[in-house]
Amino acid sequence: MDKFIDNMDVRIKSESGSMQVFKQVTGPVPTRDPSARADRRNMTSPSFLAASPMENPALFNDIKIEPPEELLESDFNMPQVEPVDLSFHKPKAPLQPASMLQAPIRPPKPPTAPQAIMVPTSADTVTSAAIPTVLTPGSILASSQGTGGQPILHVIHTIPSVSLPNKMSGLKTIPLVVQSLPMVYTSLPTDGSPAAITVPLIGGDGKSAGSVKVDPASMCPLEFPSDSDESAIESGSSALQSLQGFHHEPATMVHMQGEESLDLKRRRIHQCDFAGCSKVYTKSSHLKAHRRIHTGEKPYKCTWDGCSWKFARSDELTRHFRKHTGIKPFRCTDCNRSFSRSDHLSLHRRRHDTM
């Protein structure tokens, strides 16, 4: 028992000796001061760090990097728009409220007062169409001299298509000259098809200067001038004259083209079918004779003794046969000369006209 106690004393002494050697090698162990923990927030000041730069390296492990409280307090009531940078080395950009980041709201433009045009659709219903009073790109300005030399400005509007129920759906755009308020008078028959539309024209003196009647089916404007049309033309209204020419000339051209197209359908129905030839004839016999030019066929042969002439047309053979017989049926009434061909007589008469 005594030996065991002696061994324990030796072991304790050896361990205490080794502990003292370890303390001499490593140095004193630093202890934390409770007052230093309370002043942790003030450890970020440069004076504290400069006083003890690296004496206690263990203290730097307990430093918690945080942004200054004044920065956090200034942003407490503001909504977070972007991620917050908590580093000390980067300057913090000032945050803008969410209301300042929104697009500016433009006030709406005040609506323009439209003009109303009353269009009577039947005996008891009236439909109004709105036309803006401001000048649109489709508006045309024209000036004229009124009574007393006072200039009058005419505005040529284009009435847009008015979406009306049932019978008024066939109306289209109509150019007209307006001075105060244009009126479009429309009469509808009982069968439901829209009739002609009469549009009045207002002159420089404020009186009616004619009217334009438009057929909705063909949309071909026709002009019917009134009694005061001559005075309106004499007053030198350039706007009215240009508008009347615009409505009158296309109507005449369309009317003539319509008659010509009907005439072509009735008469010029025989057309040559050879490539590159566009000849059209009113009779099939003329087309048949024309086709012989392409084929080279000459069925008409001269029967005079010793003559071998052939012709593609019978009138050419008759004209040639007069050379053999000497017959000259075409006689001049001024000089009693005779010719075998009618075209020769026409050339001869021109000489009398020039003398």
UniProtKB/Swiss-Prot annotation:
Q: Which GO terms describe its molecular function?
A: DNA binding; DNA-binding transcription repressor activity, RNA polymerase II-specific; RNA polymerase II cis-regulatory region sequence-specific DNA binding; zinc ion binding
Which UniProt keyword terms apply here? DNA-binding, Isopeptide bond, Metal-binding, Nucleus, Repeat, Repressor, Transcription, Transcription regulation, Ubl conjugation, Zinc, Zinc-finger
Q: Where are the zinc fingers (C2H2-type)?
A: 270-294, 300-324, 330-352
- Disordered as annotated region, ranges: 19-52
| Keyword Ubl conjugation carried by entry | yes
User: Which superkingdom heads the taxonomic lineage of this protein's source?
Assistant: Eukaryota
From the Swiss-Prot or TrEMBL record, state where the protein is found.
Nucleus
Q: Does the keyword Transcription regulation apply?
A: yes
Q: Posttranslational modification, per the record?
A: Sumoylation at Lys-64 represses transcriptional activity and reduces cell cycle progression into the G(1) phase. Has no effect on subcellular location.
Q: What does this protein do?
A: Transcriptional repressor and activator. Binds to CACCC-boxes promoter elements. Also binds the GT-box of cyclin D1 promoter and mediates cell cycle progression at G(1) phase as a downstream target of focal adhesion kinase (FAK).
What subunit structure does UniProt give?
Answer: Interacts with corepressor CtBP2. Interacts with PIAS1, PIAS2, and PIAS4; the interaction with each ligase sumoylates KLF8.
**Protein's name according to its UniProt entry:** Krueppel-like factor 8
Q: What is the species of this protein?
A: Mus musculus (Mouse)
Per UniProt, what is the name of the gene that codes for the protein in this document? Klf8
